[in-house]
Amino acid sequence: MAQLTLIADGRATAPLGLPGGFALRSPRAADTEKLGQLYFDSRVPGARHGDAAEAIQEVRSFFQGEFGDFWPGASGVIERDGKLVAALLAVHRAPWDDTPDCPFITDLFTDQRFRRQGLARTLIIRCLTQASSTARPQVALRVDSDNTPAMRLYQRMGFGLRGPE
């Protein structure tokens, strides 16, 4: 399975209304364990790598800056009844040489029970809207080429294959 880098132009978009009972806010380092558990649980069993402890450590590494400078305004978590059900983690720029010089979504994940309700779309709109007001008004991300549902979502949201720089 190959990873593809996709990029979209940032644009101010009216936010989607969340379904009743959901709340959107910026993630905090205090959310690390809950985010890590959600990250692990959101993966289908065949696609999981490692265990919940490794997922929590990956989120901890994100907040420690290992994936770039955390951008709280473009990132988001969605809660329902006090439980995290979806998250998008973004940085001002990814630290890897092969990524575009623009904001980058490092992770986007949704509890399997809450998929197809517009939560990921709402989080992406928040990120694209924030990016639209920056000097680098684009957003990039990586996705596994065989992740058809994610590819469809990203294409509908305006993401396309990264062209030459």
How should each PLM-predicted stretch be described?
Residues Q37-A53, E66:
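Helix-loop element at the rim of GNAT/NAT acetyltransferase active sites that forms part
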Residues S75-V77, K83-H92, F104, F109:
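Conserved beta-strand in the GNAT
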Residues F104, D111, T122-Q138, G160:
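Conserved acyl-CoA
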Residues M1-G21:
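Acyl-donor-binding surface of acyltransferase catalytic domains
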Residues M1, Q117, R121, S145-G163:
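Conserved active-site alpha-helix within GNAT-family acetyltransferase domains
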Residues Q112, Q138-M151:
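Conserved beta-strand-loop-alpha-helix junction that forms the acyl-donor binding cleft
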Residues A23-Q37, R48:
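A short beta-loop-alpha structural element at the N-terminal edge
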Residues A52-V85:
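Active-site rim helix/loop that mediates acceptor-substrate recognition in acyltransferases
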